[in-house]
C-alpha cells in the first residue's frame, strides 16, 4: 500500500483514500488503541479529525485482523504519485512541493521533499499510471458537437468499461482537450480539491504553466501556500458567513488563446475519488467568442439571460481576483447558450421587481412560472442527490410548503385551482451501495447520517433506488444532483436541473415566513447549476424521453425510468455504516 504523500497533514475523511494509502501516524495510534475504540491522540493533532480517520481504519482494518495485516498497512514505503513531473519541459514545471507549506524538518518532511519528489520524476511518462480512463486526444470537439442540443455528460466510470466509449461519457482530460481550444488560463471553483491530482491533469493536458485561479471551500493544508511553489496558481478559500455554510459550487472557466472562453458546470469535486467510480454530471457550454471592442453593453446575451445571472453570481463572492474574469464574461458572446444559470448564494433574499427571486428554489420557481409548459398536477417532482438535509418533522414542513411548492410552478394562468404534485426522491439504498463497484466504500460520497435520518422516518415512503442500467452506472454510486418532472405515459420531460445543490435547506433556501413583511429566502451555501427548459433548447414544450422525436434527441436522464421504489425491507444508505 502506498504511503499518503501528505503524511501527518492528511485531512481526508474518505474511506476509499484510506483503502489506498497508508498513514504511519494513524497506524501507530490505531495499534495502541484498545478494542473498545479508545485512543490516545497526541495534543498536536486535531482530535476530531484523527478520531474520524481512526473510525475509518476500524472499518477497513478490523482489530481481529492479524498484526501482519496491520503492519502491511503501515510499513509500505512506496509513496503515492501525487502529480507527475517532467524535467526540461516548459509546460510542466515541478510538482514536488511540501504539501503543508512548512519548512522541511525531521524525517517526515525529508521524505515529502526527497523520496516523493524522486518517485514523481520516475513516474512522469505514462499517463495511464496516473489516470485510469484515457481517451485518445483530439476528439472532444466532435464529441461535444454530437452532444447537442443538451451538452450534458456523465463522467466515465473506471470499472464500467461500456462508459469508456459511451458518447455522453467524459473524462477531465477531455474537458482540457486542445480540440476545444488552446487554453491560456483557467478558473476552478470547487468544494474539495486535491491540488496534486488536479495539477497532474494539467500537466498531461500541457497547461501546467498556465495561470490557474482556484476558489475552494473545504479546508486544505496544501492549498494554503501552493502559490509559493507554483506561482501560476492563485488559491483562495471562500469565506463563509456561518460555520455550517458551504462553498459547494463546482464550476470551471476555460480561457482560450483566441480570446474565446467556455463555462463548465459540474457535480464533481476535484479529487480522484469523484472521477473514479461515481456517477457525476457536467454541462459544457459552446465556445463563447470575444465580442468586438465596440460592442454594445448588452451585446452577447443569451435568450436565457445566462451571462447576466452568472456575473451577478460571481460578484457575490466579493473576491477581487475574479474581476478580470467577470470583465471577460461581460465581453464574451454568450448568445449560443440555451440553458438558464441557477445559483444559490448565502444570505437572506427577497423578490425583486425585475428578475423576480434571484437565488435558490425561489429563482427556479420564477423561471418555471414564466417559461415551463403547463404540467398536469399528477406528474411527480423527482429529486435526486448525494446527501439529504434535515427536512422537518413531516413532508409538509419544508418539502411541500417550500420546495415542491416552487418546483410545481408552470405557465398555467394564475387562478386555476392546483394540487400538490407527488414527491419522489432517488437515493441509494443499503443494497445499492453494497452491490456497487467499490462495495460499501462506494457509499463514501453519500454523507447522509443516522442522526438526521432518525428525525425524518417519513422520508422512506418517498425514496426510490438508484438504478442506471441504461447508462451502465447502476453500480456507480451517484454524486450527481438532479431535479425534474417527466411523464412516462407520453414519454416527455418538462424540464431538468443539473446542479451542485443537494436536497437541503442550506442549498436551496428556506422561507422565513412573516405576515408583516415580504418572505425572505435564507440560503447558507454557494451552489451552481443549469436549468434545461424545452422552449429554449429545442423550441418545443417538452423533451423526448427514451427515444428521439421528430429529429430531436431524447433527453439523457442519468437514471432508469420507471423508477424503482424502496421495498419494505430496504433502508437508505447511511454514512454511519462506514464509520462504525
Swiss-Prot record:
Record site feature (Interaction with DNA), residues: 504
Principal cellular location given in the protein's record: nucleus
Alphabetized UniProt keyword annotations: Cytoplasm, DNA damage, DNA repair, Exonuclease, Hydrolase, Nuclease, Nucleus, Repeat
GO molecular function terms attached to this record: 3'-tyrosyl-DNA phosphodiesterase activity; double-stranded DNA binding; exonuclease activity; single-stranded DNA binding
Subcellular localization: Nucleus; Cytoplasm
Residues given in the record as substrate binding sites: 250, 481
Enzyme class label: hydrolase
The family this protein is said to belong to: Belongs to the tyrosyl-DNA phosphodiesterase family.
Protein name: Tyrosyl-DNA phosphodiesterase 1
Lineage: Eukaryota, Metazoa, Ecdysozoa, Arthropoda, Hexapoda
Amino acid at each position: 500500500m502506498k504511503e499518503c504523500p501528505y503524511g501527518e497533514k492528511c485531512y481526508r475523511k474518505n474511506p476509499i483514500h484510506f483503502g489506498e494509502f497508508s498513514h504511519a501516524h494513524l497506524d501507530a495510534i490505531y495499534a495502541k488503541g484498545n478494542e473498545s475504540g479508545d485512543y490516545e491522540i497526541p495534543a498536536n493533532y486535531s482530535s476530531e479529525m484523527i478520531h474520524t480517520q481512526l473510525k475509518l481504519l476500524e472499518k477497513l482494518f478490523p482489530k481481529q485482523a492479524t498484526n501482519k495485516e496491520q503492519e502491511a498497512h503501515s510499513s509500505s514505503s512506496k509513496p503515492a504519485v501525487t502529480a507527475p513531473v517532467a524535467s526540461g519541459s516548459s509546460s510542466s514545471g515541478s510538482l514536488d512541493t511540501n504539501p503543508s507549506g512548512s519548512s522541511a524538518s525531521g524525517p517526515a518532511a525529508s521524505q515529502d521533499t526527497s523520496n516523493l519528489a524522486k518517485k514523481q520524476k520516475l513516474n512522469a511518462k505514462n499517463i495511464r499510471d496516473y489516470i485510469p480512463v484515457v481517451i485518445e486526444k483530439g476528439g472532444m470537439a466532435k464529441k461535444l458537437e454530437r452532444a447537442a442540443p443538451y451538452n450534458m455528460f456523465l463522467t466515465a466510470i473506471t470499472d464500467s468499461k461500456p462508459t469508456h466509449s459511451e458518447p455522453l461519457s467524459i473524462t477531465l482530460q477531455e474537458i482540457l482537450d486542445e480540440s476545444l481550444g488552446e487554453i491560456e488560463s483557467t478558473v476552478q471553483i470547487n468544494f474539495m480539491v486535491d491540488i496534486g491530482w488536479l495539477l497532474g491533469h494539467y500537466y498531461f493536458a500541457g497547461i501546467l504553466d498556465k495561470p490557474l485561479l482556484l476558489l475552494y471551500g473545504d479546508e486544505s493544508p496544501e492549498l494554503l501556500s501552493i502559490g509559493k511553489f507554483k506561482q501560476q496558481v492563485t488559491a483562495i478559500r471562500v469565506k463563509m458567513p456561518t460555520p455550517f455554510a458551504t462553498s459547494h459550487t463546482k464550476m470551471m472557466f476555460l480561457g482560450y488563446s483566441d480570446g474565446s472562453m467556455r463555462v463548465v458546470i459540474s457535480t464533481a469535486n476535484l479529487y480522484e475519488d469523484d472521477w473514479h467510480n461515481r456517477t457525476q454530471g457536467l454541462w459544457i457550454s459552446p465556445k463563447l467568442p470575444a465580442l468586438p471592442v465596440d460592442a454594445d453593453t448588452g451585446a452577447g446575451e443569451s435568450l436565457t439571460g445566462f451571462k447576466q445571472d452568472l456575473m451577478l453570481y460571481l460578484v457575490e463572492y466579493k473576491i477581487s481576483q475574479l474581476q478580470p474574469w467577470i470583465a471577460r464574461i461581460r465581453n464574451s458572446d454568450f448568445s449560443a447558450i440555451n440553458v438558464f444559470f441557477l445559483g444559490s448564494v448565502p444570505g437572506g433574499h427577497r423578490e425583486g421587481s425585475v428578475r423576480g427571486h434571484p437565488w435558490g428554489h425561489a429563482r427556479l420557481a420564477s423561471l418555471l412560472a414564466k417559461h415551463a409548459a403547463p404540467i398536469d398536477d399528477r406528474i411527480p417532482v423527482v429529486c435526486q442527490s448525494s446527501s439529504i438535509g434535515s427536512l422537518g418533522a413531516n413532508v409538509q414542513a419544508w418539502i411541500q410548503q417550500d420546495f415542491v411548492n416552487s418546483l410545481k410552478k408552470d405557465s398555467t394562468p394564475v387562478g386555476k385551482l392546483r394540487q400538490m404534485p407527488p414527491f419522489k426522491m432517488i437515493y441509494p439504498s443499503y443494497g445499492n451501495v453494497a452491490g456497487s463497484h467499490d462495495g460499501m466504500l462506494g457509499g463514501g460520497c453519500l454523507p447522509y447520517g443516522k442522526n438526521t435520518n432518525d428525525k425524518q422516518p417519513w422520508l422512506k415512503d418517498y425514496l426510490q433506488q438508484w438504478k442506471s442500467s441504461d447508462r451502465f452506472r447502476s453500480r456507480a454510486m451517484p454524486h450527481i444532483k438532479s431535479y425534474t418532472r417527466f411523464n412516462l405515459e407520453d414519454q416527455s420531460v418538462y424540464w431538468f436541473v443539473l446542479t451542485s445543490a443537494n436536497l437541503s435547506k442550506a442549498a436551496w433556501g428556506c422561507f422565513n415566513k412573516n405576515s408583516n413583511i415580504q418572505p425572505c429566502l435564507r440560503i447558507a451555501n454557494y451552489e451552481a447549476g443549469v436549468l434545461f427548459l424545452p422552449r429554449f433548447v429545442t423550441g418545443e414544450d417538452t423533451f423526448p424521453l427514451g427515444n428521439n422525436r421528430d429529429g430531436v434527441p431524447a433527453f439523457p436522464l442519468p437514471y432508469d425510468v420507471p423508477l424503482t421504489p424502496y421495498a419494505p425491507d430496504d433502508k437508505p444508505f447511511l454514512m454511519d455504516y462506514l464509520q462504525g
